[in-house]
Regions:
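Conserved lysine of the Walker
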Residues: 53
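N-terminal pre-Walker A segment at the start of P-loop NTPase domains
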Residues: 8-30
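P-loop (Walker A) phosphate-binding loop of NTP-binding proteins
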Residues: 46-48
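Short hydrophobic/aromatic beta-strand immediately N-terminal to the Walker A/P-loop
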Residues: 42-44
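Short phosphate-coordinating micro-motif centered on Lys-Gly-acidic
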Residues: 2, 6, 14, 62, ...
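Phosphate-binding P-loop
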Residues: 33-39
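Short beta-strand-centered segment that lines the nucleotide-binding/catalytic pocket of NTP-utilizing
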Residues: 66-81
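Mid-chain, well-packed structural core segment of small domains
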Residues: 80-106
Length: 151
């Protein structure tokens, strides 16, 4: 399936369904294993509170840094793992906030950057991303849209 981004560019997208938090984590791990992410990529996670953004991140980080313990960076704003930075933008309200946490400095490095609550910073950001939209169907099931705008 293809969708159009805001600038009218057609991007590749796929829809997946998971039936548990563990399946969401495994799904992300398998995407990484299938080379869907590489150094320098920006992964834009979108979804409501409790949708599974951190579970997705756990799977992705488990592939790149298997010994890491992944937690949500809600209060720290960023957690760093081997070759992966995990930002939580829930409390970010302005471009000045992004500057104060050194966010833009990290874009020039070769880490994979995972951004929870990407919609909060989309207006300050024009990089191409791998977009992951996670929607809660019920308590356990999730609909995940993988959209790649890098090409």
């Amino acid at each position: 399936m293809n969708i159009t981004n805001l600038s009218g560019k057609i991007i590749m997208s796929e829809i997946f369904f998971t039936k548990s938090e563990r399946e969401t984590e495994e799904f992300a791990f398998n995407l990484a294993k299938d080379n869907k992410f590489k150094s320098g990529d920006i992964v834009a996670l979108r979804g409501d509170l409790g949708a599974g953004k951190t579970a997705f991140t756990r799977g992705l980080v488990r592939f790149f840094a298997p010994d890491s313990r992944v937690t949500s960076p809600t209060f720290s704003l960023v957690n760093q793992y081997k070759n992966v930075l995990h930002f939580d933008m829930y409390r970010i309200n302005s471009e000045d906030d992004l500057l104060s946490i050194g966010f833009f400095d990290e874009l020039d490095k070769n880490n994979i950057i995972i951004i929870e609550w990407f919609d909060k910073i989309a207006d300050f950001f024009d990089e191409e991303t791998v977009r992951i939209d996670i929607a809660k169907i019920n308590e356990n099931e999730r609909k995940i849209i993988y959209a790649d705008t890098r090409y």
